[in-house]
A protein has these predicted regions:
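Membrane-helix entry/capping segments
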Residues: 2-11, 15, 51, 213, ...
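Intracellular coupling helices
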Residues: 6-22, 26, 291-334, 396-407, ...
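Hydrophobic alpha-helical transmembrane segments of multi-pass inner-membrane transport and secretion
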Residues: 15-41, 273-308, 335-336, 416-441, ...
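Alpha-helical transmembrane segments
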Residues: 29-58, 349-358, 427-455, 735-743
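Small-residue-rich transmembrane alpha-helices
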Residues: 32, 36, 241, 252, ...
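Membrane-proximal juxtamembrane linkers immediately C-terminal to transmembrane helices
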Residues: 42-63, 89, 131, 189-192, ...
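Hydrophobic, regular-secondary-structure patches
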Residues: 44, 53, 58-116, 123, ...
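Mid-to-C-terminal secondary-structure elements
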Residues: 118-134, 145-275, 472-655
Length: 785
């Protein structure tokens, strides 16, 4: 019997190829989109879950209180880890992680600057699951000058030699011995590194700060079995105050597996990666629903043409139960074929999708089994619902009435299809409007004026003892025609940190805690970055006090001080007691996702970490070569290493750009699926009304009138979908935009454009079938009447 059902189903597929293609392809594309998005979402959700101790791992974070506002910080003081472990019951172990990049590593004739180095406590390799291919994780980081490297680094420096025991020289002075080789760090680890060095080395080199008021490093803890997060949070809440009584900082633990999706830094909690997971999950659901609606719509429409088949089967002895099983089986087989085809599409497209998403995606992702089981369930449900109309309605017909042609599709079935079309286009419109707003917001952030010029600007890290040659290098560069300006700073201008270090000015409430961005700079900073001044002047060598005694602040500081003019006012901050000589116009010194906060800069040449060089526009290659030639002349022992500031910004928003591209693709596919369904439905509607069209043409109806008649119903359904979608999209996207400090407007043109696109899609889908029906010779439609 089952074999017979399959044979009949295959026969129907080949007999009605167009219908079968539209129905199966639409559902398959929808399922494939859902699977691809699900794999991406599951990969996002899988971050850091591969660690054996993942459920008991946490990052220590801070909530700093400033004038009623909370500044959330993910870095902590250097000595916090051991102290919190020793003094807090329930904490099993602690590990500190410090970024220690920017080191020159040399082995024989190979020398490279390495940026992806972490200095960690020895407990790091016991707490976290980062297996070693060579070496012992329990002892690999015990010696201060030991080094654990990745396979890639081992190949880079030692080729096919055994790296164990080899000596690498750091910054031409300190020798480190390779004591371990790491397996490749999984891509779904938020901690990424190529090398691990002992934290003890930093202490020995005097590169740590024992103050509990300085936040620079990450601190991770592992809880004892059976200890709850709430218990430990209660114990550590006021820990900083036991060391710094004047502090307004609280501690809390962040579950390690939540860091990738839910971490935030600063005053405002932005949407973060979790928001995009929610968006893509909704898109996957919408696309799948649209595809399933298509399938059910076309199946019920097509079944109306099979009444005579039902009559003939009953005449030759088929029972109603046989027909019910036949229609259910046929519908489920159709849906199953679509599922198999979807799996094949995903397998074929996964490499390209991985490249587009910049991820290592595969079927082997945690949770995919549950998704597949769910999709199989949806396949069966869709097949059963789509088969219910022919199985239960058509199978109840009396053969005599069917064969006389006196049975017609009821109003209930027609209205059901109309409801499905409206629902389908409502979802499509939500996707179109939502994707447009998301893409518009991403474009707005990337195009937003920063308040300083990032074009043709490079920065050079002043690593190791390069800093000693800074002034000589600057003097050589400023004489070059390819260079328009040279300066230095302790931070790159797109990532200036904030500080709460004892700010004061006349009239300030001593109890008022404020957080101010701070960067040490060199002369020519304002001019090189092309920052606009609102009041006062830039730093000048002509003023002796400008060296470590003068401040330039932004408009936010001036507003904080509450005075019309702050130039000439006394101002103290981070141990510098001086005077404000100028006010800069506000500029973005962190991500454009963040609100511009107060900022102060001061000339302190000893604290410079970066050289900033503005190249002459035009032949950038020649300008870079000129800078490199000067570098090699002044600092021959170190390779020339630089970054373009605008490329840094591109990297900063690259993930969001990729997400915007993915949103566009999936929305286009969703609309395409809706088009397929509407095209098929229009075809069957025209077929059902063939006789009516013939009569109308005999009575004098023109081709345009008949075309309008057939298109009108679908246009009205799409307009109704707009009425339903607009308020949902407006309130949904308005809420989403509130996650951003600086956001684009929710223009009414977006909604009008979405409506126009939906109507255009409907016209393109329906008009072909309508025109074909309208130009048909009425004699063909009425020849049997």
């Amino acid at each position: 019997m089952i074999k017979n059902y399959i044979v009949v189903t295959l026969r129907n597929i080949f007999k009605h190829k167009g219908y079968a293609f539209i129905n199966i392809a639409g559902l398959a594309i929808g399922m494939a989109c859902c699977l691809l998005i699900s794999i991406w979402v599951l990969d996002e959700l899988s971050y850091d879950r591969f660690h054996e101790n993942a459920p008991s791992l946490y990052r220590v974070e801070e909530n700093q209180h400033y004038s009623g506002r909370i500044y959330h910080v993910t870095v902590t003081p250097y000595p916090l880890g051991p102290a919190i472990k020793d003094e807090t019951a329930g904490i099993k172990d602690a590990a500190r992680v410090v970024w220690a990049g920017g080191q020159l590593l040399r082995y024989q004739d190979k020398a490279f600057f390495e940026s992806n180095i972490r200095a960690v406590d020895p407990s790091f390799l016991q707490m976290f699951t980062f297996p070693l291919l060579k070496g012992d994780k329990d002892t690999a980081l015990d010696a201060p000058h030991s080094l654990v490297i990745s396979e890639e680094i081992a190949q880079k420096y030692f080729s096919d030699e055994d790296p164990m025991g080899k000596v690498i020289t750091v910054n031409n002075t300190i020798e480190f011995t390779v004591t371990g080789v790491l397996q490749k760090v999984p891509h779904n680890s938020h901690l990424q590194f190529d090398m691990l060095a002992p934290y003890a080395f930093l202490e020995k080199a005097g590169r740590t700060d024992q103050s509990f008021g300085s936040n620079s490093i990450f601190t991770f803890v592992q809880l004892e079995e059976g200890v709850t997060l709430a218990e430990v949070n209660e114990k550590i809440f006021g820990f900083i105050r036991t060391r710094e009584p004047q502090s307004a900082t609280d501690l809390e633990l962040m579950p390690y597996t939540r860091i990738h999706l839910h971490q935030h830094f600063g005053f405002e909690k932005t949407m973060g990666a979790a928001g995009y997971v929610y968006i893509f999950s909704i898109i996957a659901f919408f696309v799948l629903i649209i595809a399933c609606i298509n399938f059910m719509n076309l199946a019920t429409a097509r079944s109306a043409n099979r009444a005579k088949e039902v009559g003939l089967r009953k005449v030759v002895g088929a029972l109603r139960s046989h027909l019910i099983r036949q229609f259910y089986s046929e519908s489920v087989i159709f849906a199953t074929i679509a599922l198999v085809l979807a799996a094949a599409i995903v397998t074929l497209l996964l490499p390209a999708f991985s490249s587009l998403a910049d991820k290592e995606l595969s079927w082997n992702v945690s949770g995919i089994g549950a998704i597949l089981i769910g999709l199989i369930g949806i396949t069966l449900f869709t097949g059963i619902v789509a088969g219910s109309y022919p199985a239960l309605f058509l199978s109840s017909f009396q053969p005599v009435k069917v064969l006389r042609g006196s049975i017609k599709s009821g109003a209930g079935a027609t209205n059901f299809r109309r409801v499905l079309v409206v629902f389908q286009f409502t979802l499509s419109l939500l996707l179109i409007i939502g994707t447009t707003v998301v893409f518009k917001q991403l474009s707005y952030m990337q195009a937003r004026k920063l308040g300083w010029d990032k074009e043709h600007l490079i920065y050079i890290p002043l690593r190791a003892d390069i800093k000693q040659s800074y002034q000589a290098l600057k003097e050589e560069l400023v004489r070059d025609q390819h260079v328009l300006g040279v300066t230095g700073s302790s931070h790159i201008p797109s990532n200036i940190g904030s500080n709460s270090g004892g700010s004061s000015w006349e009239g300030k409430d001593p109890e008022q805690a404020v957080l101010i961005g701070f960067s040490s700079v060199d002369f020519d900073y304002i001019e090189t970055l092309k920052i606009e001044m609102k009041e006062g002047r830039a730093f000048s060598r002509e003023h002796q006090s400008d060296l470590s005694k003068s401040f330039i602040v932004n408009e936010e500081v001036a507003e904080l001080m509450g005075k019309e003019s702050v130039v000439g006012e006394r101002f103290s901050f981070v141990g510098v007691d001086g005077q404000i000589v100028g006010v800069m116009k506000n500029f973005h010194f962190q991500s454009v996702r963040e609100v511009i906060e107060p900022l102060a800069i001061v000339v302190v040449p000893d604290r410079l970490q970066y050289m900033l060089v503005r190249l002459a526009p035009g032949d950038i290659t020649a300008s870079l070569q000129a800078v490199e030639n000067t570098w090699e002349h002044v600092i021959p022992d170190y390779p020339f290493d630089y970054r373009f500031m605008d490329e840094d910004f591109d990297r900063m928003y690259r993930a969001e750009s990729r997400i915007g591209t993915l949103l566009n693709y999936f929305t286009i596919l969703a609309v395409l699926i809706a088009c397929l369904g509407l095209f098929g439905l229009a075809s069957f509607t025209a077929e059902q009304r063939t006789k009516e069209i013939g009569i109308r043409k005999v009575l004098g109806a023109s081709v345009s009138q008949v075309t309008y008649l057939l298109c009108r119903e679908f246009f009205l359904l799409v307009l109704l979908a707009n009425v339903l979608a607009w308020p949902l999209a407006y309130f949904g996207m308005k809420s989403w935009l509130e996650n951003y400090a600086y956001r684009t407007g929710l223009s009414w043109m977006i909604f009008v454009a979405a409506m126009a696109l939906a109507l255009l899609v409907a016209l393109a889908s329906v008009s072909f079938q309508a025109l074909r029906a309208a130009v048909t010779n009425p004699a063909r439609a009425l020849k049997y009447e």
